[in-house]
Curated annotation (Swiss-Prot):
Molecular function as annotated in GO: structural constituent of ribosome
Top-level taxonomic group: Bacteria
Coiled-coil intervals: none
Source organism (scientific name): Legionella pneumophila subsp. pneumophila (strain Philadelphia 1 / ATCC 33152 / DSM 7513)
NCBIfam families tied to this protein: rpmH_bact
Gene Ontology, cellular component aspect: ribonucleoprotein complex; ribosome
Protein name: Large ribosomal subunit protein bL34
InterPro entries given in the database record: Ribosomal_bL34 (IPR000271), Ribosomal_bL34_CS (IPR020939)
PROSITE patterns on file: RIBOSOMAL_L34
């Protein structure tokens, strides 16, 4: 059976990348929350 997770760095960046996050208000709030929490990685 084919597994559901087929990793691809391109898709990863496109769907969860920093540029995408910054392009919407909700995405910016995500980055803001992660900065406040002190996350080492803010996005994919």
């Amino acid at each position: 059976m084919k597994r559901t997770f087929q990793p691809s760095n391109l898709k990863r960046k496109r769907d969860h990348g920093f540029r995408l996050r910054m392009s919407t208000r909700a995405g910016r709030l995500v980055i803001k929350r992660r900065r406040a929490k002190g996350r080492k990685r803010l996005s994919a």
